[in-house]
Design a protein with these regions (language model features):
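S-adenosyl-L-methionine-dependent methyltransferase catalytic module, highlighting the catalytic core
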Residues: 120-134, 138-245
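A generic short-segment signal for beta-strand/edge and adjacent turn/coil regions
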Residues: 48-52, 108-111, 188, 208-213
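Conserved N-terminal segment of class I S-adenosyl-L-methionine
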Residues: 1-102, 110, 227, 233-240
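Conserved SAM-binding loop
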Residues: 54-158, 203-204, 241-246
Length: 246
């Protein structure tokens, strides 16, 4: 039996469920539990059950992705879960949006940055995460990543649309320089909110982006025995949850 570190309830997992996107219990999978595990550990220097934490509205946080547990975070903290296209809105490339959120204790961004457009520059998104934090504030961050070479699938994406031709989705792009491009074999993911994947990060590229944004204490957290107790398992060492401080 495992204890859900979000709800505090007990649950079982089958062997085949013990992976990043598996292990669903009470609406939360292994990735969600891992994010919450690290959030409480970073805040309290100890692992806490999110539902049982005392309310503290002096702690200010922001979510870019985590509607699955945003209700609990909003209950416990001065916390807002943002969206890209509607209020409360945060376009991480938009300086006006970024200025609305500042002096944050923490930001949660889980599996978002692989969908961000390459224009104007993905580095700007990492820089803006840093800007929104207070000194010593931190991020709990994840994206799919591998070991090897970073891949930008559409590096010159600028003015594009997706069309269907002969039952195949094609991306038709006009670059900033006016050149015409067509791509097939598009990669979509995102669960209920299907989006086009723009890139595949690597561990080294993530370290570079975070370091260039001036983050420190960058850590990639491979599930250990303490995490296993809460039903947190990975099936490989790719796409781990990351924490980093300002």
């Amino acid at each position: 039996m495992y204890t859900c570190n979000i709800t505090g309830k007990k649950f079982n997992l089958e062997a085949g469920e013990k992976n990043r996107e598996g292990g669903l219990a009470f609406g939360y999978n292994c990735r969600f539990r891992a994010v919450t595990f690290l959030l409480t550990k970073m805040l309290y220097h100890n692992v806490e059950i999110l539902s049982k934490i005392l309310i503290n509205k002096d702690i200010k946080g922001l979510g870019m992705s985590d509607s699955a547990w945003s209700v609990l975070c909003e209950e416990k903290y001065d916390y807002v879960n943002t969206f890209h296209n509607f209020e409360p809105k945060l376009d991480i490339y938009d300086e006006h949006d970024v200025k609305k959120f500042n002096n944050l204790d923490f930001i949660i961004s889980s599996d978002v940055f692989q969908f961000l457009l390459p224009y104007p520059d993905i580095q700007i998104a990492f820089n803006n995460l840093y800007k929104m934090l207070k000194p010593n504030g931190f991020i709990v961050f994840s994206v799919p990543f591998v070991y090897g070479d970073h891949q930008e699938y559409y590096p010159n994406l600028y003015d594009y649309k997706i069309v269907n031709h002969d039952d195949e989705n094609l991306l038709v792009n006009t670059t900033k320089n006016g050149e015409y491009e067509v791509f097939n074999n598009l990669k979509f993911s995102g669960g209920d909110d299907i989006k086009l994947e723009m890139r595949m990060f690597t561990k080294s590229s993530l370290i570079q982006y975070l370091s260039d944004a001036d983050f420190i204490d960058i850590e990639f957290h491979e599930p250990d025995e303490d995490m296993n107790k809460f039903g947190i398992f990975w099936d490989n060492i790719c796409s781990l949850i990351i924490t980093a401080r300002k």
